[in-house]
Curated annotation (Swiss-Prot):
Located on the platform of the 30S subunit, it bridges several disparate RNA helices of the 16S rRNA. Forms part of the Shine-Dalgarno cleft in the 70S ribosome. Disulfide bonds: none annotated. Part of the 30S ribosomal subunit. Interacts with proteins S7 and S18. Binds to IF-3. It comes from the Bacteria. Belongs to the universal ribosomal protein uS11 family. HAMAP family: Ribosomal_uS11 (MF_01310). Transmembrane segments: none annotated. The keyword NADP does not apply. This is Small ribosomal subunit protein uS11. It comes from Ureaplasma parvum serovar 3 (strain ATCC 700970).
């Protein structure tokens, strides 16, 4: 996970990558250097339990506690993906003690790009 060191800044960026099978939370400083990360799988959940919003919340709390110890106080959240656990992860970051200053959805949307496989058509 993260090294225990005091930071000279208090703002950061939280990246939440929510897929249909897992949720990955990465906390970085403003330059993009990763400070801490956690996922539903790294917390210890396997199989279908990784997709639950509860496991995403636990992962977000674990990642947030590591950076709060370093001195991070507020984050800007970038959410990517259409998974069910996006909102829970944001609420868990707030509940862990991080102030959320901005929420930005960075999910890529095709403007009639590649043809999808058989199922989504």
């Amino acid at each position: 996970m993260a090294k225990k060191k005091k930071l000279s800044f208090t703002n950061g960026i939280a990246y939440i990558h929510a897929t249909k099978n897992n949720t990955i939370i990465t906390l970085a400083d403003e330059q993009g250097s990763v400070l801490s990360w956690a996922s539903s799988g790294s917390i210890g959940y396997k199989g279908t339990k990784k997709k639950t919003p509860y496991s995403a919340g636990i992962a977000a709390e674990a990642a947030a506690k590591a950076v709060i110890d370093m001195g991070l106080k507020s984050v800007e959240v970038h959410v990517n993906g259409t998974g069910a656990s996006r909102d829970t992860a944001i609420r868990s970051l707030q509940a862990a003690g991080l102030e959320v200053t901005k929420i930005k959805d960075v999910t890529p949307i095709p403007h009639n790009g590649c043809r999808p496989p058989k199922k989504p058509r």
